[in-house]
């Protein structure tokens, strides 16, 4: 068979990978709850009065991965997994990095992601982030589940080389993690209440 005979056409009908970030109280979790048959992996206690299926509040990276593994390996009828929220998950990931690497290369004890120096901690954090994304990819590719990552927004200064600098909203994540997640997602959506 020639390489030209292997060309496929048409749409790829895989479930979507979505990140929705926005200002506080805009309805990000409500958006996730309106997805087809959602189940929430909570990393923050913010679902309030939403009537939605949810795992108990994750207090560690292992709790998050256990929820992903349960959705992968056990029978269920959920169609969407909602991680609420990515920025609170990042805090759990930083704790996991410190658990995995409790000292610097020079033997100094680590108590904060900043203690590694030269942004090494944030680079180390990309490994557990990839583990999470790999697990979510398995849910999407092998279990047919849509993935929604909820994140809060922050305002940051953007130095545009073609125009004047300006403030803009971005996900409240470290820039390396944010870039990794945004590249992984099919859609990156922003929600605001301004008209």
Descriptions of predicted regions:
Residues 12-18, 50-57, 114-124, 161-165:
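Short, basic, glycine/proline-bearing loop/turn elements
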Residues 109-130, 170-174, 178:
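A short acidic, glycine-rich active-site loop
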Residues 2-97:
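Conserved P-loop
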Residues 67, 89-92, 135, 180, ...:
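Alpha-helical scaffold elements adjacent to nucleotide-binding pockets in ATP/GTP-utilizing enzyme cores
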Residues 131-143:
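Catalytic-core regions built around general acid/base machinery
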Residues 77-80, 142-149:
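Loop/turn-to-beta-strand initiation segments
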Residues 83-121, 161-164:
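Conserved P-loop NTPase nucleotide-binding/switch module
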Residues 147-195:
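Phosphate-binding/switch region of NTP-binding enzymes
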